[in-house]
Structure formats: structure tokens, C-alpha cells
Amino acid sequence: MFRFVQQSQLRKAWVPNQLVSASRNSLHAQNSLRFNSAAAVERTAETVGGGANGYGGSGDAGAPLDRAVNKVRSMRRGFKLGKSFPKPPSPESPWYHKVCAFDEYVASSLNAGNETGSAGWAKSQRATMFWDSITKAMNLYRELLLSQELTQARVSRLLSLLHLALKINRSNMTGLNKKPDYDSQSFHKTMTNYLYASFKEISQDVLNGQVTVAHVGAFHLLESFRELLLAEEAVLLWRTATASEKPGLVAPFMHPDPVGIMLPLLHEGGMTFEEVSALYEKCKKGQNPTALHCLTLGMIKVCLSAGANAEAVGLFQEICSLPGNSVSKATLTGIHLAFIGECKDLQLATVFFNRALSGETPYKMNIHVSSVKQLLQNIWDQTEDFEQVFDVWRRASNYYVGLSSQGIFSSLNSKFFEIFFQKYRNDKVAGMQHLMEIITGYNEIRSVDEPFLNIILTKCVVWKDLEIIENIEESYQIYQLSKSIVSCRILLKAMGCVEVSNEQIYSRWLRLVQKADQIGQTYIANADWAALRDATVGYIHQNQKEEHADSPENLATSYPDYNPALEAANASGAFDSDLPFGEHGNAIKKHIIATDDRSELYFRMVKKFGQYCRDSKQLVRITRGITESYPFTKEYSDNFMSMDVSDIQMPKLVNLRSKSQLFASYF
């Protein structure tokens, strides 16, 4: 047909040493006002423009390391740490040694964070010490709650440190070639959850009056919740604090900086534009204009959201008219990005986007991919002009070439192809032709890689065409790419959108299990079981839904440990060596699966391979646990233990560990 041309539970007291050691993986920190996206680099005019063919433009592949050196340095310089270092306690205090240790851990970690841009820092002992000091500081914080030594300054500096750690951890995740499995005990996942638990703990202590914070601490606390995509928790914290009668609690949360964080969140939560404006004026009154940057940024975002573009431009002009270097780079960048991504006036948004691309700004501009994605969505929502969407995507891709991690491209491409398949949902012939052109053109910008094809493969299932899926699979070989376990999961999962035999699904499942074994997994992960589920019972469930009402195709995948902080990383694929299917592919016989009932196939596979579950809880979750979402599977679940699977072949496995005793404790 077509062929291509070319929130989990953590022990609060500690983080395992082996996970701290994992922090030696590269840290590409960045200054980001958004959760999952920044390419903090300086660009030359040559790297911005496209070539004559409309796709051209390639970055300097050797320059990113030097540019990355300044990422966290820039971020660290812009951090609000407070002007005064906490006054040391009296040597006669019984808490003296613990307070000194607390101050030392916080200070040394903040200093280490300032060095994360250096080329050798990520692999040095200091990287491990940075994360270890954070956990030790939190342990001492809990012990010092009984004392009177946790001053506003100390608590605020601790929150500054935790916020910096959150940014560094997020930057690491953005730089990964592959996002962690949702059931894996990855360092990034563990630290994200640990940091969230720490923020939550301190916020409760603040509200309970056990500790107080300065406005700097309130800023970092609220901003951290926002960056974790936990707007409701930020709003609840702010409303509770500002309505409190406890002394010293209202003032720091009503300071212009924390309120600047809250204005857009409050507006999104239902506060009217007039009410937000009144709060803005209240906080602004009597303040030095040079101290209102964060507040003004928040109000500009609200104006753009409400369509008050003239007011937003006026506020921006006020900021730009302030003298000298009184306005931080982070503020100017944040305002510029707000106009790109949050302005509904496409002409105005495009002007800001073009100026950022060309460097025609009096300040250094770093375009965050989240703002570009918002612009793409706004263009499509308002005009459905795909050519305009394509133009912005192409130019943004040229901008990021050689300057950004894989996660940035995966995030941008995911949004672009989401829109692409909306346009061509009902015209796969024209869509496939255009897709071939896009892939060829993209290969001129940067080499087609596995994550790029994974995204296409994931989204092309709306066409429900097995031949297209297989042709896309062939493109991995065309572009000389090895399929990782992520690709194997996607291919199995895609079987839930097309008419295929159980024999074909079984074949895909065996390849996935063998791949898991080949890369060293010791148990079959949740993501692997989810792919099997979506290919089998998910297929039946979707057909039942379509029989009752027309509904958009949405091949859903749920993970029990879903975490927005991980999801925001949005990078898929890894460059593992591929595993040949081998003899087992040829040995499959039609009588292995006696029926084409996909529900029965699912439970038979679980019965055969369930011995490779992580534990009994996982086994119960993938059997009895799915009956609530898929009631039609209850019959099979009830008869699960009596199923005969002796006719199903078991491939030779090396690393997966059999736990046959799981079935003994199943009941």
C-alpha cells in the first residue's frame, strides 16, 4: 500500500543510596517557568532560518555542551534566596550542633546547585552529595520542629533548595531518551515523589503554625506546587493561609511575589477578571515598581487568558520602561512566552514567536516548547489551518536542532501529530501521502529516530489500518533504527485498534516478553501488561462503546502510579539493540489459541506468564483488578485458576525471574 522513503508512598526519612547514586546521570538543568519544557540556549541567526527547501537549518552539534554549562547557573542566579543568612544559634543551645548541620547541608547544596552546569559535575561525587544533603536537611528539619531554631529564614532557604532540586530533577527527566516506566523505581520518579512529600509536609507545618516562612519561602512553595501541575493544592494552601488568623501567616502569602504566582491559578479556578484585577491592585498599592515583576507577569497572563490583550501589552510596556537591569531575565522571558502561548490573538502571538526565533529582542530569549505547543493548539482551534500549524512546527524544529534534548522534540512532535491526525482522521489516503512528505522533510532537519516513529505509530491507530501500522514498523528498518521495548509495547497495543487474529497478538506478546528479558527486566512490568490488556480486552471494550454511541477512538492506557511530574517529561523510546523473534515466531500454531475471543486470550496469557509478575499484588491487579473497568471479563477472572494453558509455548528466558508461588497465594 504505502511505503516510506527514507502519588506513591515513600519513607520520608531517607532516599536509598543506590537511587542517590543514580543522580550521577547527566543533569541538564534549566531555567523554566513551565513544567516540562525549556531549551535554554543562545542562538545565532544562522540556526534560526530554514533552508530553501522549507525544512533546512541545522544547529551546531558541538555547541550545546557549552551552552548547557550556563543553564543552571542562570537559573541559580535568578533564584530568590533571601538577602540574609540565618543567624547562627548560641553555642550553649542544646540544638546548636543540629542547627549548624542543617545550615551547612542547605548552604552546601545550594552552592552545589550553582555548579550543575559544569561539564563534569553530573558524574562527580558532588552530584551524589547534592541529593544526599537534601534528604539529610529534611531529616534535621523534622527534628528541629521541636526547637525554636527553625526561623523564617531557615525554612525559606530549605524551600528554595527543594525548589531548585525539583527544577534540576525535571531537567534531568526532560533530557532522558526514555521516560521511566510507571512501575519502575527510577531515581527521577523517587525524587519527584520525595520532593512532593516534602513540600506537602512543610506546607502543613506552616498552616498549623509550627513554622513560619518569609515571602520568599511562600513563593517557592506555591511555585513548586504549580510546577508539579498541582494547581488545586496551591490554591487551597494560599486561600487557607490568607484567611488564617495565625500571626505571621497572611503577610508572606499576600506579598506581590506569591500573589503573582496565584493570579493565573485563581482565574483558572473561577475568580472573575474583575476580582483578580482588584487583588492585583491591592498588592500593587504602595510597592516599589521594581519589586512587582512577578505580580505583573501573573496579571499579564490573566489579561491574555481573558482576552484583554491591550491591557497585557500596556503592562509589558511598563515593565520594559523600568530603568537599568531592574527586571530579571526570567521575568522578561516569562512575559514573552506568555504572549506566544497564552495570547488568543494569533497575529500578536505570532509576532512574539517570530521575534523570539530571530533574536529581535533586547533580552536573551529561550523558547520553551510548552509555549510553542500552546501556539500550535491555538492556531488549530481557531483556524483549522494545518499549513499554518505545519509552518510553526517546522520553524520550531529548526530552532531546537542541536540545542535540545530528546524530550523537547518528543513533546513538540507529539502535539504536532496530534493535530495532524485530527485533520486527516477521515482521509487516510491523503493523510498518508502528506505523512510521507513530512517524514522525509523532518529527516532533513534532524535524523528520523525511534521516538519520532513511536509517536506516529501511537497516533496512526485512528486510521484502524493494519497495513499502515506494518508499513510504519518497516520504517524502523528503513532508517536503521532498533526497536526498543517502548516500540514493542506500542506495536502490541496498536493491535487493539485493528482486526487481527489472536495468533498475531500472541506473536507480538512473545516479542515483547523476550525484549523485556533481553534488556534485563526481572519481572514483567505494568506497562507490558497494559499493552497486552489494550490489545485484547481493550479492543472488546472499545467495540462495545462504539456499538452504543459514536465515540472518538482513544486507545487508553492507565498506570497505577501515574504521576503528572513524570508525564510532563513526555519522552519515549530508547536505542536498545533489537531482539530477533527467533524460532518461537515460526513455532506458533493455530491451535494454541482455540478461540478468537480476545478476553480469553488475555487471561490465558496472564495464566501462562503470571509467574513473572513483580508480586502477588500485581497479579491480582491484572486479573481481578480489571473486572471493574471491564465487567465482561468477570467470567474469565472467576475461572482463571482452572484455565488449561499447557498448549502455550514458553520461550527461553534468562533474566525474568519465575515466582510460581504467586499462584499459591492468589486466593
Swiss-Prot record:
Record's GO cellular component terms: mitochondrial inner membrane
Processing after translation: Phosphorylated. Phosphorylation promotes binding to RNA.
Protein species of origin: Eremothecium gossypii (strain ATCC 10895 / CBS 109.51 / FGSC 9923 / NRRL Y-1056) (Yeast)
Transit sequence range: 1-12
Similarity annotation: Belongs to the RMD9 family.
Role of this protein: Binds the 3'-UTR of mitochondrial mRNAs. Involved in the processing or stability of mitochondrial mRNAs.
Compartments (UniProt record): Mitochondrion inner membrane
Protein name: RNA-binding protein RMD9, mitochondrial
